[in-house]
Structure formats: structure tokens, C-alpha cells
């Protein structure tokens, strides 16, 4: 939630006359993951996906946990193979580092962020029946599709698979 302050007309106003004060960020504890995959910090998800304080912490936490569970399920066989090869964490699996972070961990967090955000957007669509509302819904649908695509691509990158499989019929 946000606080919106609208000054009275008689008060001197500069600019548009409204000041938006975002709700102070509360304490959002890191979400613990399984032993193999990294924990997820809700603050990083908010920053990466530009969610700021527009989503309640409880809703964001639920969406992230769902994203983690689904991504973990998608990577179950990959995880089993890597554990059999002697790796105890995703961060231990050989991969390039960018900015001091394993590419595999980066893509894992990207997959979770994309899925959590897609899930939130699907549930936050408006019920506006006007032409403007329809156009906005189409734009949101496109964004949701792109987020699901990003999730699939990130999961493929973790597994060193191509982003898409094309076959001739």
C-alpha cells in the first residue's frame, strides 16, 4: 500500500501537486529453499521485477514460494544427476561466474522471479470492460507470456539445453 498526499488548492504547489510516499519496506525474511537450490530474497525479487511495494509481502512470498516449488520440480532430474556427480548445491555445479555469481544460480533466481511475477500479474488483471481496459489486458497478457518464456529459457540454461526444440512435422 502507498500513502498519497494531495495538497489543498490554497497551498502553494509545485509541479503536479501530488506527492507519493511509498510505504516503508518492512522486514521480508529470506525464503529458505531445499538443500540444493539457493534461498530467495524477496527484496531482490521486488527490485528485479520492479514490484516495489505494489504487492503485499504475504502475496509476494506466496508467489515466490510457488515459483521456487515449480522451478525445483522442473529441475528435479537435473538435481538428481548433479547430486550423483557429487555436487551438493547448485552453486557448486561448474559454471561461469558473472559479477561473482554462478550463471546457474543467476538463471535459477531469474526463473523464480519470472514465474512469481507472471503468477502475480495473472491474478492482478483488472475487470475493466472498456476498450481501454481490453487494451491494457492484452498488454498484460503479452507481458505474462514473456515472463513464462523467460522462466522456460532460464530453466533450459541451467540444464545446458537449447532454449527451444524445433522439429519438423
Feature map (PLM): residue ranges:
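A short linear-motif detector with a strong N-terminal bias
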Residues: 91, 99, 144-146
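Non-transmembrane, amphipathic alpha-helical segments
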Residues: 52, 97-104, 139
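Amphipathic, non-membrane alpha-helical segments in soluble helical-bundle scaffolds
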Residues: 35, 57, 102, 106-110
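Conserved short "hinge" loops at termini or chain/domain junctions
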Residues: 2-93, 97, 153-169
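Short loop/turn elements at secondary-structure junctions
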Residues: 104-169
Amino acid at each position: 500500500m502507498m500513502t498519497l498526499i494531495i495538497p489543498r488548492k490554497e497551498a502553494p504547489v509545485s509541479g503536479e501537486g501530488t506527492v507519493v510516499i511509498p510505504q516503508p519496506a518492512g522486514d521480508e525474511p529470506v525464503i529458505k529453499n531445499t538443500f540444493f537450490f539457493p534461498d530467495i530474497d524477496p527484496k531482490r525479487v521486488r527490485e528485479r521485477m520492479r514490484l516495489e511495494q505494489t504487492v503485499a509481502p504475504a502475496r509476494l512470498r506466496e508467489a515466490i514460494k510457488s515459483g521456487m516449488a515449480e522451478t525445483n520440480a522442473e529441475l528435479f532430474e537435473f538435481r538428481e544427476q548433479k547430486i550423483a556427480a557429487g555436487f551438493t548445491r547448485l552453486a557448486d555445479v561448474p559454471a561461469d561466474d558473472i559479477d561473482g555469481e554462478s550463471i546457474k544460480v543467476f538463471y535459477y533466481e531469474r526463473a523464480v522471479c519470472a514465474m512469481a511475477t507472471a503468477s502475480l500479474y495473472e491474478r492482478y488483471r483488472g475487470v475493466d470492460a472498456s476498450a481501454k481496459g481490453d487494451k491494457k489486458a492484452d498488454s498484460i497478457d503479452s507481458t505474462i507470456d514473456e515472463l513464462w518464456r523467460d522462466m522456460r529459457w532460464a530453466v533450459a540454461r541451467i540444464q545446458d539445453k537449447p532454449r527451444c526444440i524445433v522439429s519438423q512435422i
